[in-house]
Regions:
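Sec-dependent signal peptide recognition
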Residues: 1-10
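Central antiparallel beta-sheet cores of small beta-barrel/beta-sandwich binding domains
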Residues: 27-108
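Acidic, contiguous internal or C-terminal segments within carbohydrate-active enzymes
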Residues: 111
């Protein structure tokens, strides 16, 4: 019985730990449902970022960010950092932005 209680306490505590969002994620096209790209989510200096590491659709190969503004304008979409400056608030990653490379628009982002 004591072992069961210890096991239940252990699993309860592990459920309270935040799930890491870091790693490789696959994006999906909203309209077609096809897998569109691989995005690497990573931490740097305590902030969370996301970079497109590979475009999966043949028609997207070699595309550049035509509608982006500033330093991202004209850059290849593969390699573009699209998730920027998310801060951990103790419960979630907040106060960052995400770039839509198709439209060039920036949106508020949280995870």
């Amino acid at each position: 019985m004591t072992q069961l209680i210890h096991l239940l306490i252990y699993f309860s505590l592990t459920l309270l730990q935040p799930v890491s969002v870091e790693g490789l994620w696959i994006t999906q096209d909203d309209e077609s449902g096809k897998q569109k790209s691989e995005v690497l989510i990573y931490k740097e200096n305590g902030k969370l970022y996301g970079k497109i590491v590979r475009l999966l659709l043949p028609e997207d190969q070699g595309k550049i960010c035509v509608n982006c503004k500033g330093k991202d304008k004209g850059k290849p979409i593969a390699g573009l950092v699209i998730v920027n400056n998310l801060s951990w608030d103790g419960e979630s990653w907040e106060d960052g932005t995400i770039l839509d490379p198709k439209s060039g628009k920036l949106y508020d982002c949280y995870i």
